[in-house]
Amino acid sequence: MKDTYYNMDCIAGAKAHIPDGVVDLVITDPPFAIEGDQLHRLYNRKEEHVVEGYVEVSRENYRDFSFRWMEQAKRVLKDTGCMYIVSGWTNLLDILLAIEHNGLEVINHIIWKYSFGVSTKNKFVTSHYHILYCKKSGCDVKFNPYCRFGAAEKDQEGSSMLYCDLEDVWVIGREYKKGRIRNKNELPVELLKKMILYSSEEGDLVCDFFLGSFSSAKVARSLGRYSTGFEINESAYLQQVGHISNIERGWMLAGLRSNEGNPHFNQRKRWTKEEMGSVVERYHNIKRTGVTDRQAYAILSQEFGRGYFSMMNIIKKSKSARSPY
């Protein structure tokens, strides 16, 4: 697997370049259907040092556009995969209708609370975005509850750090990179880290249909994942694509918090061939006792200190390797 990016429209690009069911996680921040010079008035997105050529979608076409790109996102997503869609309130209805139209299910409607909203005199200050955390209807998705905090970890007031991190209101500051060239719609590293850690594993494929500043791709690589995606703005694409290969894959993993209290105590460690072989051997021994695959994966998860879906993926890969088809 390798990181692959395309300077083209995401709908045509996905049809041409990404097969069905190969993506583990979609993270994307689609255009807001607001004229570029008006975006800062609603969401306090400052315009200095912004890459030229931001491509917007017209308000009249936004609903149809949302239906079509989300159809492709669902197609490329694995049944165990999920999707995070970042949206402002101005076109939230179109995004929700596109989710329903494409047979996706909202797991959580997350509120991302940021600081420094636009000062107003005649209305309340806008200081949040919506994040729709979705999956294919009827499917079970990857979720790593102990990827950031252990069950026993407490803050200075004695409250559970894990519980706080799992709440659906995320207070994460936006990044102001004074004097540095950036894209108009750039998500903060901490926000991306949280989504990627909770919903994927090392070696998984992350896709962004609107790469922009390539922030999702950069964080994915830094956390040991692979990434793909599309950026229609040639200036933004050329300005960012060359930087990806300079990022050491997985360098952020060493800086993660301790795994205290996590029953999946090996979750953050790299897989070895020996460990994978041991999992497969143990799986066959367990199956001889007459248990179901689901029960076998649960036993393996407990014994090897890895997530349920990690066990399932290892076994599926071993079966595929033995299959002549």
Language-model regions, residue ranges each:
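Pro/Ala/Gly-rich low-complexity, hydrophilic intrinsically disordered segments
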Residues: 245-252
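Short, charged amphipathic recognition helices of the HTH superfamily
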Residues: 286-302
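Short, amphipathic alpha-helical "recognition" segments used to contact nucleic acids or chromatin
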Residues: 272-291
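Short Lys/Arg-enriched helix C-cap and helix-to-coil transition segments
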Residues: 252-258, 322-325
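Short, Lys/Arg-enriched N-terminal segment that forms or immediately precedes the first helix
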Residues: 260-268
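Conserved SAM-binding loop
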Residues: 240-241
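DNA major-groove recognition helix of helix-turn-helix
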Residues: 244, 315, 319
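Core catalytic lobe of class I
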Residues: 1-237, 299-301, 305-311, 319
